[in-house]
Regions:
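Histidine/acidic-residue-rich catalytic or RNA/ligand-binding cores of hydrolases
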Residues: 4-14
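Catalytic domains of carbohydrate-active enzymes that cleave complex glycans
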Residues: 13-164
Length: 164
């Protein structure tokens, strides 16, 4: 079971901060992404930057007690989600030669897919494509539950398909 959005990066940064609370977090984040995501790292780092910039602009954060609906008018607007989609498309293309790197990159993309599905962004075909992508990636990673353990992946997918 994966441990949430960017769980590997979070663990790495927490370890670095435990050793040196005054370390350069940005430098360590870049170092981790270059090593873990390889050629996808510039796009993933840009996604993280865009997400943080939008959150800062609106003074809004998404926490475990909220949902995508809470950020629909801030950092999860349809326009921003389309931008995140493009960044991850480039990231996936950059590592398409390696199944493991591609799965790591797709795993990082799961939260974007989840938000877009919940917010029902895009045409019916685009929404169906996202649902199918989410299901495939979730199964490949072994993800069983979503929404802080409220619902299984299979039930989430079934519900999303029913709302098409």
């Amino acid at each position: 079971e994966i441990g949430g959005e960017f769980s590997e990066l979070r663990g790495y940064l927490l370890a670095k901060l435990a050793w040196d609370p005054y370390c350069n977090v940005e430098a360590h984040m870049e170092d981790f992404c270059k090593g873990y995501y390889k050629e996808a790292s510039p796009y993933i780092l840009e996604y993280i930057k865009c997400l943080h910039d939008a959150q800062d602009k609106f003074g809004k954060r998404l926490d475990i007690f909220g949902g995508p609906q809470d950020a629909k008018k801030t950092f999860l607007t349809q326009k921003l989600v389309q931008h995140y989609d493009k960044l991850f498309a480039m990231a996936k293309e950059a590592v398409s030669y390696d199944k493991e790197l591609l799965l790591r990159t797709e795993t990082a993309y799961l939260p974007v897919l989840y938000a877009a599905i919940v917010l029902q962004y895009g045409s019916r075909n685009k929404r169906l494509e996202r649902i199918n992508q989410f299901a495939r990636i979730a199964r490949a990673t072994g993800l069983k539950m979503v929404e802080e353990w409220k619902i299984t992946v299979d039930q989430f997918v079934t519900d999303a398909l029913a709302e098409l």
